[in-house]
């Protein structure tokens, strides 16, 4: 009984490998159909578009998180830079005052 199973398994493996080599078009030997790749891209927030020469181009669709949170490029960077400079100056002043207290002792 077990030998019949092994024979069927070997036959199926040989048949699949020979059948995939017989296709002249390499696109026909793919394991997953085109619809599966398009569905998985839709889940990831992307879509497939056709190029000029027939190739597939993957484009990213705007994700829903972009509607909720602002992107860093949309924020006013001058305010952030000014706040960072003030924080650096305060840090330097605190460091100098600590060194001055240490030298006075």
Swiss-Prot record:
Keyword Transferase: no
Short sequence motif RxLR-dEER: positions: 39-57
Transmembrane feature ranges: none
Keyword Secreted: yes
Protein localization: Secreted; Host nucleus, Host nucleolus; Host nucleus; Host cytoplasm
Position of the signal peptide: 1-21
A Gene Ontology cellular-component term: host cell nucleolus
Keyword entries, A-Z: Host cytoplasm, Host nucleus, Secreted, Signal, Virulence
Induction: Expression is induced during host plant infection.
Homology family: Belongs to the RxLR effector family.
Job description of the protein: Effector that enhances P.infestans colonization of Nicotiana benthamiana leaves.
Comment, domains: The RxLR-dEER motif acts to carry the protein into the host cell cytoplasm through binding to cell surface phosphatidylinositol-3-phosphate.
Name listed for the protein in its UniProt record: RxLR effector protein PITG_18670
């Amino acid at each position: 009984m077990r030998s019949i199973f092994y024979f069927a398994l070997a036959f199926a493996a040989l048949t699949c490998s020979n059948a995939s080599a017989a296709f002249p078009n390499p696109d026909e030997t793919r394991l997953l159909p085109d619809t599966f790749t398009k569905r998985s891209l839709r889940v990831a927030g992307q879509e497939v578009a056709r190029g000029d020469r027939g190739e597939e181009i993957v484009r990213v669709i705007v994700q829903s998180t972009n509607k909720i949170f602002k992107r860093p490029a949309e924020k006013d960077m001058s305010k952030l830079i000014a706040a960072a400079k003030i924080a650096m100056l305060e840090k330097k002043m605190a460091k100098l005052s600590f060194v001055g207290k240490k030298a006075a002792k």
